[in-house]
């Protein structure tokens, strides 16, 4: 049970401290108060970003606005987590040489005064109240006043007392001392020989063994100077820059990821429709990759921007390699479908047939289907002097038809777009899907039905030839946010332009004539290298239609998610208050094993209808069109609660949907904020402010996945439900940054991008190196979707060279090499693919036997660390730490079926151990564990 009682207030002490603060503010230089200048599987979210050899200077203005400066934890790096105060005004200049400078006393006072002001935010603003405002403020800042090692240190209880006054305007000295002592007891004492870190700016992390020092230069963890002592110890090894190929190109490693998806389809141990589903995923992944990543490469090449990337390759070289590898893989996919999966489906009674294989009765019935269902929605478009070559929409399936006029003898070209409103695979009449077994289902591609009725569309013309083709267009959005008076309107305008992006790929059937192929290449203004030739049918992503049919015996066995016991006890027939459950115990959710609908969705729903709830704040990156989350926020606003939604309308391929329900939220009275200029808001956060008998209490959810009920059934994600005051204060601060002006911020339990996440991780990696060199327990275990950030990768290389064991679980893009002599012998990388898309992010550090574990939304990519608002939360409750430690241990143990990265950069699938015993499927293990928890 988390203590939340209201606390008495030492009024006289508060008055004296307020007077002291006012005196400092009155004499301070006004400039000290100025802000710094500045105004999966299909989840891969293919955001085009700068070449990996460039820095994030293009978004410096946005980062200056988000003046968080979270370079570490509010507590010690050893025992705490969080983010720091921003650098001084000359930080930007000094950062060029890897240094920042502590602010002046007046600036520090201004910062603290700003914190005091923020601490008095109203209940509706979610800053807290009687209990959570005063009590939590005292506790929070008492901890901040304690030294980094967990002892009273330089500031002690008195400092904690003063700081708590600044934050909340009231405190009790004894309570501050007690809380500081409590925190000291939770953090391990610094051992002899502990590494002395680098002093931070006011309000930021101080590493073990460091006392506060005034006006000292701080070394940026991203700089080489920060790692100088480690590099000196590794002088006998070749310098890192002697390994020019230590970074794998991000585009090429993505191709490797999609190859692993294809290998899932090759697995004959899987149900046949599941194999077809993986073929579908492979195709849809490649579509998005070309729409964004390849389109971006082509655009840079056309503009002459082809610098050498971190991988040592330039854009032209990368594009050539992508093209050759993608064509090989699509050829392998087509062969797998034609020679393996398609026959296996037929054997299971699910046949994909063609027109020539039908009997006359079946043809007659399909002709009637064509006349009444298909013909009315077709629009043939001819090309002649009065009809220019038509616009071909991206990812549409089309028929290219060559016609001859029997009177003139002239040939003509026409195009027919197959409508998206009709099924791609038509069930043959008489052989439809029924409950009868064995199955006798026959499906015919829609293009076959249309092709054999072209005489209905072109009466009086001779049909010379017809071929199916498909184009992929550039789907990047280009919105100048700094110049856009209304971001929503600018996005809507750009979405209208996106459909006319340049063609980047043409897919054709292998039966196409050279003439038609060349004609399309010229009209689409592409090259022959952009043409992909495959046997029919094209666009195997539509196999998902067949997978979605009600044929359970040929798919993964259905799993029903469970409700965590803490939320809905077995003894109760009625759903209990989720707030009561959270007060008793922090709840760690693991979706889809734990049901999203009865946990996160229920949390928001109860908040919307609970009369004691005053305010709800939530970030929304992706959600479904009929989202119960959105409906709950609307209902809350209509019931008079203050509701704030931070909506990211730039979420890749969900822009239109997000705009629609953002307007719906606004109409209902929800305060809709579109994030920060230049930054995508990618963190997954919810904050609920509730009036309780002992005052206000704030309830939080921090997750790794989107608030999307549908994808939550297929994505593996983690989430934390808590009313911990440190987390609540951090979320309050972050929401205030996102919705208003709160540039001076510090965090206790969060690491927040773009300011502090990378540096917070770098500091922890260095701490593990130092601990290992001092003979203490040290290891690093990280699970992410992608890793390409060069500074993080180099830090992990340094850890490996120092002897620290590094285990990585990377589902997708992986720019690191492992097992390379002198570079990465101690780095081990696995990749897990299965029925659920592995989407959670876990960062775990040994911390000298006191594991420090974070979960959150951020991957180790430039966009996540530099151009997005991301948040990781430190898990502190011992049983939850133990559970996460067990999970990442399992996934890195070698006991499960997974892909392993080899020193030559290839991936090897391992399904059996050295004795030939079949390895466990980690997702099956977790499904069994979830069921066991609620029995």
Regions found by a protein language model. Give the residues of each.
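D/E-rich low-complexity acidic segments and tails
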Residues: 4-86, 107-154, 164, 173-191, ...
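N-terminal localization/anchoring segments of enzymes in phospholipid and broader phosphate metabolism
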Residues: 2-4, 10-13, 31, 93-97, ...
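Arginine-glycine-rich low-complexity intrinsically disordered regions
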Residues: 88-107, 157
């Amino acid at each position: 049970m988390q203590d939340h009682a209201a606390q008495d207030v030492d009024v006289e002490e508060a008055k004296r401290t307020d007077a002291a603060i006012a005196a400092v503010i009155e004499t301070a230089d006004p400039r000290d108060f100025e802000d710094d200048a500045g105004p999966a599987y299909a989840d891969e979210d293919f955001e085009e970003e700068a070449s990996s050899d460039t820095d994030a200077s293009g978004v410096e203005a946005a980062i200056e606005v988000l003046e968080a400066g979270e370079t570490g934890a509010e507590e010690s790096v050893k025992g705490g987590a969080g983010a720091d105060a921003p650098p001084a005004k000359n930080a930007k200049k000094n950062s060029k040489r890897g240094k920042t400078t502590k602010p002046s006393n007046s600036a520090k006072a201004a910062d603290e005064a700003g914190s005091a002001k923020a601490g008095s935010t109203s209940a509706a603003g979610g800053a807290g109240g009687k209990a959570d405002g005063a009590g939590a403020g005292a506790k929070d800042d008492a901890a901040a006043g304690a030294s980094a090692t967990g002892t009273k240190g330089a500031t002690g209880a008195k400092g904690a007392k003063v700081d708590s006054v600044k934050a909340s305007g009231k405190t009790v000295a004894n309570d501050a001392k007690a809380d500081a002592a409590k925190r000291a007891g939770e953090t391990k004492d610094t051992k002899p020989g502990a590494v002395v870190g680098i002093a931070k700016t006011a309000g930021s992390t101080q590493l073990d063994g460091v006392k506060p020092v005034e006006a000292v230069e701080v070394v940026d963890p991203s700089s080489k100077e920060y790692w100088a002592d480690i590099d000196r110890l590794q002088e006998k090894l070749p310098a890192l820059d002697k390994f020019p190929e230590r970074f794998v190109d991000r585009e090429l490693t993505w191709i490797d990821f999609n190859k692993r998806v294809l290998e899932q389809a090759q697995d004959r141990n899987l149900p046949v429709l599941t194999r077809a589903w993986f073929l579908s995923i492979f195709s849809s992944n490649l579509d998005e990759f070309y729409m964004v990543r390849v389109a971006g490469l082509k655009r840079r090449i056309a503009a002459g921007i082809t610098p050498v990337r971190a991988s040592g390759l330039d854009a032209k070289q990368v594009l050539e390699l992508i093209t050759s590898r993608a064509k090989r893989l699509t050829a392998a996919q087509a062969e797998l479908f034609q020679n393996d999966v398609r026959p296996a489906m037929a054997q299971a009674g699910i046949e994909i047939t063609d027109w020539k294989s039908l009997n006359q009765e079946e043809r007659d019935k399909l002709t009637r289907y064509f006349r009444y269902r298909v013909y009315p929605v077709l629009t043939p478009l001819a090309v002649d002097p009065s009809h220019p070559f038509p616009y071909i929409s991206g990812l549409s399936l089309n028929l290219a038809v060559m016609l001859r006029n029997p009177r003139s003898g002239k040939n003509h070209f026409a195009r027919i777009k197959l409508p998206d409103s009709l099924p791609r695979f038509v069930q043959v009449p008489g052989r439809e899907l029924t409950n009868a077994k064995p199955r006798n289902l026959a499906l015919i591609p829609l293009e076959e039905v249309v092709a054999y009725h072209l005489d209905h569309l072109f009466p009086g013309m001779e049909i010379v030839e017809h071929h199916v083709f498909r184009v992929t267009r550039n789907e990047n959005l280009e919105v100048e946010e700094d110049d856009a008076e209304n971001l929503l309107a600018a996005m809507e305008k750009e979405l209208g332009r996106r459909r006319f992006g340049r063609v980047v790929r043409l897919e054709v059937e292998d039966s196409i004539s050279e003439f038609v192929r060349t004609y399309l290449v010229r009209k689409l203004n592409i090259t022959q290298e952009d043409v992909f030739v495959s046997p029919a049918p094209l666009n195997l992503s539509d196999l998902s239609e067949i997978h979605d049919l009600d044929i359970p015996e040929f798919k993964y066995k259905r799993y029903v998610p469970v409700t965590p016991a803490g939320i809905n006890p077995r003894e109760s027939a009625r759903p209990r208050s989720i707030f009561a459950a959270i007060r008793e115990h922090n709840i760690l959710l693991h979706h889809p094993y734990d049901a999203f609908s009865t946990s996160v969705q229920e949390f928001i729903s109860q908040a919307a209808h609970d009369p004691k709830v005053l305010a709800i704040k939530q970030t929304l990156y992706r959600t479904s069109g009929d989202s119960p989350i959105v409906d709950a926020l609307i209902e809350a606003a209509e019931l008079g609660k203050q509701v704030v939604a931070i909506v990211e309308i730039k979420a890749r391929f969900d822009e239109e949907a997000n705009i629609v329900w953002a307007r719906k939220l606004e109409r209902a009275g929800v305060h809709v904020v579109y994030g920060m200029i230049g930054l995508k808001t990618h963190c997954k956060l919810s904050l609920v402010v509730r009036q309780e008998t002992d005052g206000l209490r704030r309830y939080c959810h921090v997750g790794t996945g989107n608030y999307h009920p549908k994808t939550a059934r297929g994505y593996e994600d983690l989430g934390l439900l808590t009313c911990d005051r440190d987390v609540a204060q951090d979320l309050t601060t972050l929401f205030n940054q996102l919705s208003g002006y709160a540039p001076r911020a510090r965090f206790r339990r969060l690491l927040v991008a773009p300011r502090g996440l990378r540096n917070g991780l770098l500091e922890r990696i260095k701490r593990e190196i130092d601990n290992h060199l001092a003979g203490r327990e040290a290891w690093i275990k990280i699970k992410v979707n992608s890793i390409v950030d060069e500074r993080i990768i180099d830090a992990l290389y340094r850890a490996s060279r120092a002897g620290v064991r590094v285990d990585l679980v990377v589902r997708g893009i992986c720019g690191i090499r492992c097992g390379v002599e002198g570079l990465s012998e101690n780095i081990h990388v696995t990749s897990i693919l299965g029925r659920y898309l592995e989407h959670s992010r876990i960062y775990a550090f040994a911390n000298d036997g006191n594991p420090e574990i974070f979960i959150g939304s951020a991957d180790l990519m430039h966009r996540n660390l530099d151009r997005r608002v991301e948040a990781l939360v430190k898990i502190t409750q011992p049983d939850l730490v133990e559970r996460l430690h067990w999970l990442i241990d399992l996934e890195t143990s070698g006991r499960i079926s997974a892909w392993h990265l080899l020193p030559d950069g290839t991936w090897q699938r391992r399904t059996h151990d050295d004795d030939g015993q079949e390895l466990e499927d980690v997702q099956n293990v977790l499904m069994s564990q979830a069921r066991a928890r609620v029995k």
